[in-house]
Amino acid sequence: MVLLYDFVLEEDEFCRLANVSHEEFLIWKDMGVVEPVITEGEIRFPAEALAKLVKAKKIQHDFELDFSGTSLVLDLLEEIALLRQKLKRYEND
């Protein structure tokens, strides 16, 4: 799958590409995994949100987690990535 990071999708197209039902999409959205962007009064979803949801679904499937467990894992992975970036900056100084 090729993603363009300035690409935005409407909700129906987002669900189709992520292969999720509308109900499942709303759960991910409520959990903060999928965050919309409002442009010109329209709600859209950026491509990076699609990549994040695909990653979330893989984690959920691989580790047999529920939605909140998956959301927690994603948050922790993001925190680890930030800490690694900070560590790399300190190591380069």
Language-model segments: what does each one mean?
Residues 2-12, 16, 30-35, 39-93:
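Arg/Lys-rich, alpha-helical DNA-contact motif
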